């Protein structure tokens, strides 16, 4: 039995609360159990230098954790004067995941800027960020459509993410913090609604994992992401 009482193939309770803040074109509070992330999507009338004059837009992301989102307070990265390698890795992952399912040409020369701020961390903050950021981006695109800012429909597919791992020799879905800190293997999987893999990040924590365990973890991730995409569609009224 897992510490949370869940079955190996069971997600934590997941909620996606849209229009959580007032000013951003898209905003979502995403909760995976006790992990809470505020995802906002802003539409900017400009693109990075490498996209200027191309007729294409851009999708990018920033990620951060509030000082007391974890058990002990950590300094703000702004106070330290630089982002950690972990932060940079996660925000690049979020941006890559979004660009996989957006047609940049249909955005015109606009940037969708996603901000993912962790309010409370209990494992899986990067996967929750991706899952919530897509819904925020979808809402931002709807605002662009209403304003006549789009060249076409930029949303090509849905995208979501989940963590999987091996804990005490058992492959499990959606690790919380106690499991994440004690697991034999930790893997983050990003997939599209059509079943394509966007990213697979897997690391053994001391004990190598077998091909059978990897296949089992990917199977759990596929199942979990299908459920998450259904929840995204439900939240969007689709």
Curated annotation (Swiss-Prot):
Phosphate binds at residues 86, 124-126. Its EC number is 2.7.7.56. It catalyses: tRNA(n+1) + phosphate = tRNA(n) + a ribonucleoside 5'-diphosphate. GO terms for biological process: rRNA catabolic process; rRNA processing; tRNA processing. Signal peptide: none annotated. Keywords: Nucleotidyltransferase, RNA-binding, rRNA processing, Transferase, tRNA processing, tRNA-binding. Residues 66-88 are annotated as: Disordered. Gene3D superfamilies: GHMP Kinase, N-terminal domain. It is an enzyme of class 2 (transferase). One of its GO terms (molecular function) is tRNA binding. InterPro entries: ExoRNase_PH_dom1, ExoRNase_PH_dom2, ExoRNase_PH_dom2_sf, PNPase/RNase_PH_dom_sf, Ribosomal_Su5_D2-typ_SF, RNase_PH, RNase_PH_bac-type, RNase_PH_CS. The keyword Cell inner membrane does not apply. HAMAP family: RNase_PH. Belongs to the RNase PH family. Phosphorolytic 3'-5' exoribonuclease that plays an important role in tRNA 3'-end maturation. Removes nucleotide residues following the 3'-CCA terminus of tRNAs; can also add nucleotides to the ends of RNA molecules by using nucleoside diphosphates as substrates, but this may not be physiologically important. Probably plays a role in initiation of 16S rRNA degradation (leading to ribosome degradation) during starvation. Homohexameric ring arranged as a trimer of dimers. PANTHER family: EXOSOME COMPLEX COMPONENT (PTHR11953), EXOSOME COMPLEX COMPONENT RRP41 (PTHR11953:SF0). This is Ribonuclease PH. It comes from Ralstonia pickettii (strain 12J).
């Amino acid at each position: 039995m897992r510490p949370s009482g869940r079955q190996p193939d069971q997600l934590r309770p997941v909620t996606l609360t849209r229009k959580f803040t007032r000013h951003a074109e898209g905003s979502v509070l995403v909760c995976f159990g006790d992990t809470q992330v505020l995802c906002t999507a802003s539409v900017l009338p400009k693109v990075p230098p490498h996209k200027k004059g191309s007729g294409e837009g851009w999708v990018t992301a920033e990620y951060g954790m509030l000082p007391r989102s974890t058990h002990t307070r950590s300094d703000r990265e702004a106070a330290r004067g630089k982002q950690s390698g972990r932060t940079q890795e996660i925000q690049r992952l979020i941006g890559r995941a979004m660009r996989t399912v957006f047609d940049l040409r249909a955005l015109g020369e606009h940037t969708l800027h996603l901000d993912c701020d962790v309010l409370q961390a209990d494992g899986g903050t990067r996967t929750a960020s991706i899952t919530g950021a897509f819904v925020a981006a979808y809402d931002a695109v709807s605002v662009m459509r209403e304003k006549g800012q789009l060249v076409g429909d930029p949303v090509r597919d849905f995208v979501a993410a989940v963590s999987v791992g091996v804990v005490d020799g058992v492959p499990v879905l959606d690790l919380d913090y106690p499991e994440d800190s004690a697991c034999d293997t930790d893997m983050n999987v990003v997939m599209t609604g059509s079943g394509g893999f966007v990213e697979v990040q897997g690391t053994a924590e001391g004990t190598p994992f077998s091909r059978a365990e990897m296949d089992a973890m990917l199977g759990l991730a596929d199942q979990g992401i299908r459920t998450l995409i259904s929840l995204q569609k439900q939240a969007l009224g689709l």
